[in-house]
Structures are given as structure tokens and as C-alpha cells.
């Protein structure tokens, strides 16, 4: 059975979840898996020499559990959308996986049909992050001492990636980002379906 898997990665507060949810509303037979749903409990998160909880690393995530969810979807891709969606014009089940460390996790490397990465400049990212409420809350200095440096490190690691990633400017409007990605996905689905 054909499947279409979209990866939406990027910086914290870059618009990944918003974009994924917008696409899910408009794409037939579409499911979303969010990497944020797979954080380990706080008691299992390492603390660095500055006293910061190390949430921005793969080890803070239960990636085996996430991969299990991805595998379940791959084995039974239409199950969450219902029978009407299976008869949609597109026909191809779509999975969107969104998260901040998708493209740094090797077991996912071979599943992407399309990959997108949202970027936001430092000041805007810091501003957006300051408006969000986290549990546990970000301690003073956490963004500059941990979050941003880890983003830069992970982004650098991505330089060895051999597949195409479309980089998106996360400061553009939600509507613009949605339109660009939606049209791109539509074209790719048409190619896959031979239309």
C-alpha cells in the first residue's frame, strides 16, 4: 500500500505544530504524530553542570515508543481516519511527524517523502519562547544556556543529511507557510499517484 510521510522539523516555537495541524485539517486521510508527546518524565531527564534539565536532546525522548507509533501507522495507515477518508480522491494515507529532533534520529531517515524545517532567528525565537508556559517552567538563562545552543548543535549535525529538506522561514505568516507546504505536498501526491 502506498503511504506518504511528511517530516516537519525545526527550532523550538518555530510553528511546527501549527503547520502540522493546518495540513491535517486540509489533507484527506491524514494523521499526525508529535515528538513532544514522547518526552520522558522529568525524573528521567539529565541535568547539566549549570543545573539545566536537558530536554533538548534525543535522550530526553522515548524515541523507541515514538518509533513504535510510527511503525503501527505504517502497518495500518488508514486506521485513524475512518472509511470515508480511505475512499478520498487522494487515496494515499498521509502521516505527518512533527518535532524538533526528527532529522537527527537515524531510524527515521528512510521514511520521509517530504521534509520541511522551520527556522526562526534568535531574537524572535527567544521572544516566542518567553510567551509559552512550560512544565516544568524554563529557569532564568535556560534559553541562552541550553535551548539555543542545542538548536545550533543539532542544526549543524543536519549538514550531513543526504535527502532534500525544504527550509522554511518561520517568521512568515501561518497562512503563507501552510499554502507553500500544502501546494508542495499536493504536487508530490499527484506525482506519486501518476496524475
Curated annotation (Swiss-Prot):
Annotated binding of Mg(2+), by residue: 17, 36
Reactions catalysed, as given in the entry: beta-nicotinamide D-riboside + ATP = beta-nicotinamide D-ribonucleotide + ADP + H(+); beta-D-ribosylnicotinate + ATP = nicotinate beta-D-ribonucleotide + ADP + H(+)
Cellular component aspect of the GO annotation: cytosol
EC number of this enzyme: 2.7.1.22, 2.7.1.173
First-tier enzyme category under EC: transferase
GO terms for MF: ATP binding; metal ion binding; nicotinate riboside kinase activity; ribosylnicotinamide kinase activity; ribosylnicotinate kinase activity
CDD domains named among the record's database cross-references: NRK1
Residues the record lists as binding substrate: 36-39, 55-56, 129, 134-135
Catalytic residue positions: 36
Pfam families: AAA_18
Entry keywords, A to Z: ATP-binding, Kinase, Magnesium, Metal-binding, Nucleotide-binding, Pyridine nucleotide biosynthesis, Transferase
Cross-referenced SUPFAM superfamilies: P-loop containing nucleoside triphosphate hydrolases
Pathway annotation from the record: Cofactor biosynthesis; NAD(+) biosynthesis
Binding site for ATP: 10-18, 128, 132-134, 172-174
GO biological process, one term: NAD biosynthetic process via the salvage pathway
Protein family: Belongs to the uridine kinase family. NRK subfamily.
Role: Catalyzes the phosphorylation of nicotinamide riboside (NR) and nicotinic acid riboside (NaR) to form nicotinamide mononucleotide (NMN) and nicotinic acid mononucleotide (NaMN).
Subunit and interaction comment: Monomer.
Protein name stated in the entry: Nicotinamide riboside kinase 1
Biological source species: Mus musculus
Amino acid at each position: 500500500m502506498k503511504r506518504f510521510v511528511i517530516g516537519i522539523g525545526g527550532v523550538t516555537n518555530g510553528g511546527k505544530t501549527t503547520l502540522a495541524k493546518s495540513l491535517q485539517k486540509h489533507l484527506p486521510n491524514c494523521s499526525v504524530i508529535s515528538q513532544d508527546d514522547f518526552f520522558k518524565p522529568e525524573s528521567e531527564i539529565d541535568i547539566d553542570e549549570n543545573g539545566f534539565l536537558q530536554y533538548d536532546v534525543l535522550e530526553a525522548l522515548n524515541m523507541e515508543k515514538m518509533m513504535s507509533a510510527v511503525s503501527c501507522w505504517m502497518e495500518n495507515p488508514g486506521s485513524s481516519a475512518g472509511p470515508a477518508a480511505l475512499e478520498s480522491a487522494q487515496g494515499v494515507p498521509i502521516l505527518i511527524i512533527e518535532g524538533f529532533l526528527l532529522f537527527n534520529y537515524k531510524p527515521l531517515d528512510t521514511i520521509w517523502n517530504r521534509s520541511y524545517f522551520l527556522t526562526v532567528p534568535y531574537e524572535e525565537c527567544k521572544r516566542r519562547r518567553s510567551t509559552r508556559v512550560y512544565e516544568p517552567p524554563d529557569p532564568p538563562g535556560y534559553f541562552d544556556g541550553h535551548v539555543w545552543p542545542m538548536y545550533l548543535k543539532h542544526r549543524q549535525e543536519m549538514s550531513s543529511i543526504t535527502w532534500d529538506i525544504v527550509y522554511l522561514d518561520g517568521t512568515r505568516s501561518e497562512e503563507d507557510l501552510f499554502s507553500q507546504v500544502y501546494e508542495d505536498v499536493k504536487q508530490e501526491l499527484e506525482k506519486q499517484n501518476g496524475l
